[in-house]
Amino acid sequence: MKALFVALALPLLLAPALTSPAAAEGSAGEFDYYVLSLSWAPSWCRSAEDTRDSNSCDPGRRTGFTVHGLWPQYEAGWPDNCPTTEPNPSRRDTREMVDLMGSSGLAWYQWRKHGRCSGLSASTYFDEIRRATTKIQIPELFSRLNRDVALRAPIIEDAFIESNPGLTRNGITVTCQGGNLQEVRICLTRDLQPRDCAPDSRRDCTSTMTMPAPR
């Protein structure tokens, strides 16, 4: 852990945004594994033009990682916007996800784009997101940040591995956007156990990024 603190303090350059593999046509319930995508809220709050729909940027909340989504994946690519006979979530369903996702609008969008491909009902999909988050321990180090730091993807990966011994570097992808940490994406089996990401998903940010401190 001492080495982790030293690495977080290193002044380095900013990183470019990460590109992603392509989406594919899909059928609900037909996929190979999940990606749990965790967004670093301070980066989003810094870059978003309008944050009124999210409480993650409220001053004094010191929000760190929030859930972006739980995404069905193929071993190559991923499905999205799958046809489904499942009804859409109610407003109450999406409001109940605000504590994890920061906004009901994001919960709705994630259901529409990714949840429909899970083959689950909306309420069960949201329950699955909650279950997935209980499987991952957020490193305490990041919640204690009191200043912006510059670091590389392996430092973040090592912190998650130290807090979650079942994880490996091949099971974590760290992305950046606009020179800031964007997301940590963790690959899970369909029953939410850690696994390696497929090769096309292992695309870490290759340069140094800034990790803005929670406010």
Describe the residue ranges of each PLM region.
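C-terminal region of N-terminal signal peptides and the immediate post-cleavage residues
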Residues: 19-21
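Domain-level detector of nuclease and nuclease-like folds
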Residues: 35-39, 49-215
